[in-house]
Amino acid sequence: MPTKARIRLWSTNIENLNFVVNQIKTLAQKTGVEISGPIPLPTSRMEVPVMRLPHGEGKKKWEHWEMKIHKRIIDIASDERVMRQLMRVRVPDDVYIEIELI
């Protein structure tokens, strides 16, 4: 029987990600279960160069667009009561969450 739940969170907006992480931490502190984390993982950075002039005449000038993806991992004891409350946590649209029982 699994005794821990691993919660993976990722988002492009770090403020919303930290908001959800703080909600999970306060939930664990209120219920008194053991929590490990949040463990920050390396930030993925994607860069897309785009040519400013689409017709290609003149000098080639480039704009660089980038997107950063911030990730966190939290390990929490998988008590049934805690898991039910965890499902009720408000998660913004740009924060993605994945729960795995280990």
Curated annotation (Swiss-Prot):
Q: Which PROSITE patterns match?
A: RIBOSOMAL_S10
Signal sequence extent: none
Name the GO cellular-component terms.
small ribosomal subunit
The record's annotation in Gene3D superfamilies points to: Ribosomal protein S10 domain
In its UniProt record, which GO terms are filed under biological process?
translation
Residues in a coiled coil are none
A Pfam cross-reference name: Ribosomal_S10
What Gene Ontology molecular-function terms does this entry list?
structural constituent of ribosome; tRNA binding
| Domain of life, source organism | Archaea
- Establish whether keyword Ribonucleoprotein is in the entry: yes
Alphabetically sorted, this entry's keywords are: Ribonucleoprotein, Ribosomal protein
Write down the InterPro entries for this protein, in alphabetical order: Ribosomal_uS10 (IPR001848), Ribosomal_uS10_CS (IPR018268), Ribosomal_uS10_dom (IPR027486), Ribosomal_uS10_dom_sf (IPR036838), Ribosomal_uS10_euk/arc (IPR005729)
Q: How does it assemble?
A: Part of the 30S ribosomal subunit.
The record describes the protein's role as: Involved in the binding of tRNA to the ribosomes.
Q: Which family does it belong to?
A: Belongs to the universal ribosomal protein uS10 family.
Q: What is this protein called?
A: Small ribosomal subunit protein uS10
Q: What is the lineage of its organism?
A: Archaea, Thermoproteota, Thermoprotei, Sulfolobales, Sulfolobaceae
